[in-house]
């Protein structure tokens, strides 16, 4: 995690240089009861998530030239929360080419995530209500 934060500015600058995109850094974005903290927004429709991988893993990824499946949930969740249409993942290690792959909204996947998040929030609401009832009973 520290490594990622250390290299993030360098990766962001390299992405900007390669793509010409204007990156808007933002904090936590809320959409109802869900939220995310993307690395950058791009224009009206896109965004960027920056990751680091050790050189041997990054080279493997470059050779496969596929969106890394271990980041699908995060990126699709971010697309859901931000209501954006596409999201780039930039994976970096100094001295290795920046790997960039774009993901587009997968509506079926997003719907499954939304259903599970709604289910979880319902369970959470019930737990909170039970705790409140118990604390009110103790206070009475």
Kindly label every feature range from the protein language model.
Residues 1-140:
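Accessory terminal regions of nucleic-acid processing enzymes
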């Amino acid at each position: 995690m520290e490594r990622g934060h250390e290299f993030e500015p360098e990766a962001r600058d390299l992405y900007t240089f390669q793509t010409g995109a204007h990156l808007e850094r933002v904090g936590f974005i809320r959409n109802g009861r869900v939220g995310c903290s993307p690395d950058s927004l791009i224009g009206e429709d896109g965004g960027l998530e920056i990751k680091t991988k050790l050189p041997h893993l990054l080279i493997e990824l470059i050779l496969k030239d596929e969106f890394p499946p271990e980041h699908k949930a995060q990126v699709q969740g971010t697309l859901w929360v931000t209501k954006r249409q596409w999201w780039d993942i930039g994976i970096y290690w100094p001295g290795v080419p920046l790997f960039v792959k774009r993901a587009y909204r997968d509506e079926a996947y997003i719907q499954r995530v939304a259903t599970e998040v709604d289910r979880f929030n319902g369970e959470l609401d019930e737990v909170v209500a039970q705790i409140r009832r118990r604390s009110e009973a103790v206070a009475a």
